[in-house]
């Protein structure tokens, strides 16, 4: 039976933080997507069809190209390997990939091969027609040899491989099987976004990512219920040697099925505008998470959140780390304990994601050496002023400069761990300077909170926050509570 309990947020955010160090090798069908938008105001006099008055046109990379675009957008490195034509569509794809910053050495443009393109025509953002230009043709011997050569050359520098099969010819006639065998020999995981009914050509892949309909077609009958999904996935695992299957289930989320265990992740989509390219986003994010150390269930949870973001966009969409982080906060909540301890750059990305979600972000700071009731009261009051609270924590060196050589009593790691475990605190950032000014400038919180022993004109960073449209709040302190006082009592042997 499928388990429905979601993974904890810590491994999800930890994996996302590692995306920047991942390189993904992407092989498959590159497609040029065109989007023509306009209005329909009359019926043609030539035939009973509407006349679309064009108002604008955009182009984007589709198919394996959209997988590459999502990987790069999420801060990782992508190496595309494919064969396209020397036509206008092919030239456009090479240019787009180069502008994106992806490597293009693995692309081969061949005369006599048509680059696939899909043109979508919409009236007021409602799609009314799709026009495809393509020729489904397997690679010839020369094209195949070139693709395998490029693949082998790039494989050593990649942590994971994606085969993006849109059935246009690149992975037909045993090419997919040969690439999978090369990956297995090299010890590299390979994920497949499959096409068609015959999954034997993907035998030995680490995982496949069919949607519910594709999964049913692969086993010869429709699947809907949880147990049907599990049975179908395990049939494919047994027949073709997959390590696991990740089945996307539209509004019902995703199922991760292995030989012995299955988990279900509920959908996170808020409002669906366009499903174009959502599967590309899912496999791109899943691959990055897996290569970043997440287990398959955690990786699927991240990919599921990513899919929920892009279906809320129009066109062949991609997403950013900030959008993905925000989606995970909606679905899994904030990180806890030590995983809420961030460096300044990670905190800045987190704050941007919170603000993107419409959440107010507060900031306070201090040494917090020996935690006492006064600290807890201050943090509780600060958190009551905002949706998310970031705590700037003086480093050990900073505390020594401010308080003297006998301080801190607790080192910065211990202090940060204790503070991060408090419900009032959403993130802790250790800073080395004597004041948090640079950190405040980097985060630009909406609300800056300090104790009432300050005045607004003496609060460090008050002018920065106010100039950015934020506000400064002074909260009452608990009388008689301080770390210095606590240390004095300990030295005197007093507990009164």
From Swiss-Prot:
Q: Where is this region: Ribokinase?
A: 1-335
Q: Tell me the enzyme class.
A: transferase
- Annotated segments matching region Cytidylyltransferase: 363-496
> Might you name a Gene Ontology BP term for this protein?
ADP-L-glycero-beta-D-manno-heptose biosynthetic process
Q: Which reaction does it catalyse?
A: D-glycero-beta-D-manno-heptose 7-phosphate + ATP = D-glycero-beta-D-manno-heptose 1,7-bisphosphate + ADP + H(+); D-glycero-beta-D-manno-heptose 1-phosphate + ATP + H(+) = ADP-D-glycero-beta-D-manno-heptose + diphosphate
Highest rank taxon of the organism: Bacteria
Q: What is its EC number?
A: 2.7.1.167, 2.7.7.70
Summarize where ATP binds, as residue positions: 211-214
Q: Keywords assigned by UniProt?
A: ATP-binding, Carbohydrate metabolism, Kinase, Multifunctional enzyme, Nucleotide-binding, Nucleotidyltransferase, Transferase
The answer, when asked if Kinase is one of the entry's keywords, is yes
Any GO molecular function: phosphotransferase activity, alcohol group as acceptor
Might you report a single GO cellular component term?
cytosol
Pathway-wise, it operates in:
Nucleotide-sugar biosynthesis; ADP-L-glycero-beta-D-manno-heptose biosynthesis; ADP-L-glycero-beta-D-manno-heptose from D-glycero-beta-D-manno-heptose 7-phosphate: step 1/4; Nucleotide-sugar biosynthesis; ADP-L-glycero-beta-D-manno-heptose biosynthesis; ADP-L-glycero-beta-D-manno-heptose from D-glycero-beta-D-manno-heptose 7-phosphate: step 3/4
Q: Which residues form the active site?
A: 280
Q: Which interval of the chain is the signal sequence?
A: none
Report the family membership. Answer: In the N-terminal section; belongs to the carbohydrate kinase PfkB family.
Quaternary context:
Homodimer.
Q: What does this protein do?
A: Catalyzes the ADP transfer from ATP to D-glycero-beta-D-manno-heptose 1-phosphate, yielding ADP-D-glycero-beta-D-manno-heptose.
Name it: Bifunctional protein HldE
The scientific name of the source species is Mesorhizobium japonicum (strain LMG 29417 / CECT 9101 / MAFF 303099)
């Amino acid at each position: 039976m499928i388990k429905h309990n979601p993974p904890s947020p810590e491994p999800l955010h930890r994996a996302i933080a590692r995306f920047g160090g991942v390189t993904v090798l992407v092989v498959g069908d590159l497609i040029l997507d065109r989007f023509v938008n306009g209005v329909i105001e009359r019926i043609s006099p030539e035939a009973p069809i509407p006349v679309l008055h064009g108002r604008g046109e955009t182009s984007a990379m589709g198919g394996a190209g959209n997988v590459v675009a999502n990987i790069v957008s999420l801060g990782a490195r992508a190496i595309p390997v494919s064969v396209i034509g020397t036509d206008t569509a092919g030239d456009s794809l090479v240019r787009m990939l180069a502008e994106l910053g992806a490597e293009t050495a693995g692309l081969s443009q061949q005369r006599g091969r048509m680059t696939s393109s899909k043109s979508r025509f919409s009236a007021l953002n409602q799609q009314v027609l799709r026009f495809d230009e393509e020729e489904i043709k397997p690679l010839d011997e020369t094209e195949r040899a070139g693709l395998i050569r490029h693949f082998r050359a790039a494989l050593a520098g990649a942590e994971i491989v994606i085969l993006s099969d849109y059935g246009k010819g690149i992975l037909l006639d045993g090419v997919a099987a040969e690439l999978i065998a090369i990956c297995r020999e090299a010890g590299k995981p390979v994920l497949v976004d499959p096409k068609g009914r015959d999954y034997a050509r993907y035998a030995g892949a680490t995982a496949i990512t069919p949607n519910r309909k594709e999964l049913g077609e692969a086993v010869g009958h429709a699947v809907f219920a949880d147990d049907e999904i599990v049975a179908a996935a395990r049939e494919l695992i047994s027949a073709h040697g997959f390590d696991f299957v990740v089945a996307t289930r539209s509004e019902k989320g995703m199922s991760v099925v292995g030989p012995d265990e299955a988990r279900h992740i509920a959908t996170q989509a808020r409002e669906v505008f366009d499903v174009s390219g959502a599967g590309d986003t899912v496999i791109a994010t899943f691959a990055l998470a897996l290569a970043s150390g997440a287990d398959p269930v955690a990786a699927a949870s991240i990919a599921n959140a990513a899919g929920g973001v892009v279906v809320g966009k129009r066109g062949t969409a991609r997403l950013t780390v900030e959008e993905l982080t925000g989606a995970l906060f909606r679905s899994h909540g904030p990180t806890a304990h030590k995983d809420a301890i961030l460096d300044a750059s990670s905190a800045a990305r987190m704050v941007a994601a919170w603000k993107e979600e419409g959440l107010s972000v507060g900031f306070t700071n201090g040494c917090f050496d020996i935690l006492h009731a006064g600290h807890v009261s201050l943090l509780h009051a600060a958190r009551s002023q905002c949706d998310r609270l970031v705590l700037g924590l003086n480093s050990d060196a900073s505390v020594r400069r401010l308080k003297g050589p006998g301080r801190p009593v607790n080192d910065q790691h211990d202090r940060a761990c204790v503070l991060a475990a408090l419900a009032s605190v959403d993130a802790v950032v250790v800073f080395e300077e004597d004041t948090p000014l640079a950190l405040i400038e980097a985060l630009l919180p909406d609300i800056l909170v300090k104790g009432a022993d300050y005045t607004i004109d003496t609060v460090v960073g008050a002018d920065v926050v106010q100039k950015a449209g934020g506000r400064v709040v002074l909260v009452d302190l608990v009388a008689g509570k301080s770390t210095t006082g606590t240390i004095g009592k300990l030295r005197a042997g007093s507990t009164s």
